[in-house]
Amino acid sequence: MKRRNADCSKLRRPLKRNRITEGIHSSTFLYLKFLVVWALVLLADFVLEFRFEYLWPFWLFIRSVYDSFRYQGLAFSVFFVCVAFTSDIICLLFIPKQWLFFAASTYVWVQYVWHTERGVCLPTVSLWILFVYIEAAIRFKDLKHFHVDLCRPFAAHCIGYPVVTLGFGFKSYVSYKMRLRKQKEVQKENEFYMQLLQQALPPEQQMLQRQERETEEATSKGMSEADSVLVAQNGTAINKKLPISLPELEYKEKGKDSAKDKKQQQHSIGINNNILQTVDAKLQDIEYMENHLNAKRLNNELGGSAENLFLKEEVGAGGGSAPSKHYKNSSPRSHNSTNGSVPSSSSNRSDKKQKCTGKNLAPHRDLMENCIPNNQLSKPDALVRLEQDIKKLKADLQASRQVEQDLRSQISSLSSAERSMRSELGQLRQENELLQNKLHNAVQAKQKDKQTIVQLEKRLKAEQEARAAVEKQLAEEKKRKKMEEATAARAVALAAASRGECTDSLKSRIRELESECKKLTHDMKLKEEQIRELELKAQELHKYKENEKDTEVLMSALSAMQDKTQHLENSLSAETRIKLDLFSALGDAKRQLEIAQGQILQKEQEIKELKQKIAEVMAVMPSITYSAETNNMTPVTPHYSSKFMDTSPSSLDPNASVYQPLKK
C-alpha cells in the first residue's frame, strides 16, 4: 500500500519542460514544413507546367466572397467581385508578363510565410531571401508559351486581389479615424453642455453629484487595483483561470455597457433638448429665467428657514438619531405635496411639537411670523413682473404681426412685379429671336452678295482687259487702214497714172476692207452694250454696299436688345433673391410669433397658479392660533410649487463618447 501511494504521488507530480527547446524544435519543424511544401510545389510546377501556388490567392478570394455574401449581403459581394475583376484586368493588361510572374510568385510565397505565428524573425527573412533569389535567378528566365498563356490570369489575380484588399483596409482605416475624430468632437460638446447643466443646478445637487462621482471613481480604482494585485501575486495560475471566467465577465461588461449607453443616450437627448430650447429663446426668455430662478431661491430660502426651525426643535427634544431622520423628511421631496396633504403634515408636526419641551419657543414664533409675510411680499412682485413680461410679449406679438403683414404685402407686390417682368422678358425674347432670324438672313444674303460681287468684279476685270485689247486692235486697225488707204490712193494714183489694169483687184480689196470695217463696228456696239451692263452691275453692287450699312445698324440694335435682356435677367434674379430673403424673414417672424405665443400661454398658466396660491395663502392666514395654556403654535406650512423644485439626482455622464438619438 505504501508503495502504491508513493507511485501515485510520483506520477501526479508535474514534469518540468524546457520551453526554449520546445520553441526551437517547433520553429525548426515549421520552417522545414515550409521548405518541403515549397519544394513540392516547385516540383509540381516543373513537371506539370502549371504554377499551383497561384491557386492559393484564388482560394482566398473565393472564401472572402463567401464571407461577404454571408455577412454583408449580395450587393457588397457583387461589388467586391467587380472591383477585384477590374484590378485583375488592369494588372493583366499593363504589367509585362515576366515581371507579372515574378511579382505574383514572390508575393504568394512571402505572404504564405508571413501568415505564420512567428512574424518577422531571422528564419522568415532568410526564407524570403531564398524565395526571391530562386524566382529572380531561375524562374524569371524560364518561361514557356503554353505555361505563360495559361497561368497569366492567375498571376494577375495574385497581384490584383491584394491591391483590392489593401484598398478596403485603407478605406476602413480612414473611416475609423474619421469616426474617432467625430467621437472626440461630440465628447467635447457633451462635456461643455454637461458643465453648463451642472452650473445651472443648485449647489446642493452639485455637491451630491460630486460625491457620487468620487465614490464611483474610488470603487472603480479599487477594483482595478485589486485586479492588478491579484494578477501580480498569483502569476500564471490566474492567467490559466481567466479564460474560464471570460464569457461571464464579457456578458456582465456588455450589460453594463448597454445600460451606460442607454443612460448616455437619454442624457444626450435631454441635453440636446435643453440646448435647443436655450438657443431658440432670446433676451426675454433669459430675463424670464432669471426671474424664475430668483423666485425659486426665495422659496427655497423661506422653506429652508422654516424647516430649520422644526429641525432645531426636534434636535433639542430627541436624541442623536433624530436629526438624520428629520433631515431626510425635510428634503425637497417633502414639499411636493398636493393641497389634500396639508392637514396631515400640519397635524404630524403639531404632534411632534407637543412631545417636545417648551424651550426656545419665542424666537421660533418670531421667525415663523416673519416667514409668511416675506412669502406674501415675494409673490405679488413675481406677478407684477409676469404681467409686465406679458405686456412686452403682446407688444412684440403685435409688432411681429405688423412686420408679417408688411412682408406679405411686399411679397405680393414683388410677385406681381415678377409676373410683369416675366411677360416683358418673354416679349423681349421673342423680339430677340425675330431679330436674330433677320440678322441670320441678312448675313446669309450678305455672304451671297459678297460672292456675286467677287464674281462680277472678276468678270468686269476680264471685260476691261478685253475692251483694252479690242481698243488696241481698233487703233492698230485704224492706223493700218489709214496706211492702207494712203498706200491704195498712192497705188491708184500711180496705176491710174501708169496704167489702168489693177482696178478690179483694188475694188475687191476695198470691198473686203469695208466688210471688215462693218464687222468691227458691230463688235464695237456689242462691247459697248457689255460695258453698259457692267456699269449697271457696278451700280447694283454700290446698292448692296449701302444695304451692308443697314445690316450694321441692325446688328447694333440687336446688341442693344441683348444688353437690355441681360439687364432684365439680372434684375429678375435680384428680385428673386429679395423674395427669398423676404420669405426667410417671414419664416423667422412666424417662429418668433409661435415662441411668443407659447411664452404667453406659459406665463398665463403661471399667473393662474400664482393667483390660486395667493388665494390659498390668504385663506390659510387666519388659521394661525395662539393658546395661552399650552403656549404652542400650530401654523399651516406655506405651499410651495413643486414645479420649481426638481430634486431628482441627475445621472448625466460627461464622458459620453458619441451622441446617439432615439429612433422614432
UniProtKB/Swiss-Prot annotation:
Low complexity composition-biased segments: 334-348
Coiled-coil boundaries: none
Single GO cellular component term: rough endoplasmic reticulum membrane
Compositionally biased intervals (Polar residues): 644-658
Disordered: region residues: 206-225, 315-364, 644-664
Membrane association type: Multi-pass membrane protein
Residues listed as glycosylation sites in the UniProt record: N234, N336, N339, N348, N655
Keywords per UniProt: Endoplasmic reticulum, Glycoprotein, Membrane, Nucleus, Transmembrane, Transmembrane helix
A Pfam family that the UniProt record links to this protein: Macoilin
Similarity comment text for this entry: Belongs to the macoilin family.
Protein name, UniProt field: Macoilin-1
Organism: Danio rerio
Organism lineage: Eukaryota, Metazoa, Chordata, Craniata, Vertebrata
